[in-house]
Amino acid sequence: AEDILPLFLEDLEKGCAKHIYTSEEWPDIKKTPVPLWSLIDMKKYQSTTIQYSRGCPFDCEFCDIIILNGNRPRTKDKSQIVAELDALYDMGWRGGVFFVDDNFIGNKRKLKSETLPAIIKWTEDKKHPFSFFTEASINLADDEELMGLMGEAGFDMVFVGIESPNEESLVECNKLPNKNRDLLASVKKIQHYGLQVQGGFIVGFDSDPLSIFKSQIDFIQKSGIVTAMVGVLMAPPQTRLYQRLKEENRLLPKGSGDNTDGSTNFIPKMGRETLARGYKHVVDTIYAPKQYYERIKTFLREYKPGNKGKLKVSLLDLIALIRSTWVLGFKEKGRIHYWKLVVWTLLKKPKFFPLSMMLIIQGFHFRKVAEKIR
């Protein structure tokens, strides 16, 4: 919108605004202004956002990022990031900040030499007012210096597209950073550096065997990825996957656009009913209290936070804790597993008790979402 919004506003003022505005060039995000946070009530938000870069150097068949933002990451200058952090701080924001990049580590050199050192200095000067989280490819695990800098800057969580434990499916979708890799070891290494891994998983690839649903469950449980976002493969318009399926006459007239409702917009090789049934089984299993709480324990055994900030517990957090204890500890069917985890955390990992409770509460939400899948 950096390039076309001024054109729209000019036409709007003249009373001749068009329905669609397009640009042939990628916008220069070095010209992106600092958001006017004063336009919203910051107290109504649990986290807020900053964007450092756009674009991703990889070309996965199902992904439309390179269509929307290109495959050559474009970044802001460190002065822009500092200015945006200042703006949030001056508005009184304290808490989570999500770097909403397509792939935060798309330009590692600049990130390590300029951007992260600037964030580290800023956050130390301000006494660690924020915790950061972002999205990155699995090859983050290959760069210990980068993981160390992210931890020092205050990053404590990262979303990673795992997609599938099936090597043939990774080859099929051209998921280059995931191929020929011990994905389980990579996840545990990232978490060892104090970065909680949230994982994205996909079922429905042509190369998926019928055993893929069990394989996904097994991998998720062993990895300790507490927040495992499993979806059915979708073919967004203009992607290479969309074009291939169109040529194979496998596209369906329309799709919901929601890859977590069990539906898709093409005819899968394993059959639509088999895929939908298997997907629901995966989601129901991984978010059942027993399996979900076991993953929290696995995660906490691996997790070694390195940042200097402390998890701050607010009055709202305490109220949520009391309410959740009543619902999860007394009313829910899986309450025995709840109390086992609470006792285990207090005995084995007491310093992680606030984090454990936060993950427990999130799990309740995930179960409610899973129940809506038909």
Predicted regions and their residues:
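Basic phosphate/pyrophosphate-binding loop/patch that engages nucleotide-derived ligands
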Residues: 9-17, 218-227
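Radical SAM [4Fe-4S] cluster-binding motif and immediate context
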Residues: 30-198, 205, 209-218, 246
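Hydrophobic "lid"/C-terminal helical patch
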Residues: 5-12, 85, 119, 282
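Radical SAM enzyme core and accessory elements
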Residues: 12, 250-253, 259-374
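Core catalytic loop region at the nicotinamide-binding pocket of NAD(P)H-dependent oxidoreductases
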Residues: 15-20, 95-97, 293
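Flexible glycine/acidic-rich beta-alpha junction loops that bind and position SAM and/or redox cofactors
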Residues: 58, 107-109, 168-173, 203-211, ...
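Structural detector of well-ordered beta-strand residues that form the stable sheet scaffold
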Residues: 20-21, 133, 198, 229
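Glycine-rich beta-alpha loop elements in corrinoid/cobalamin-binding modules
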Residues: 1-30, 238
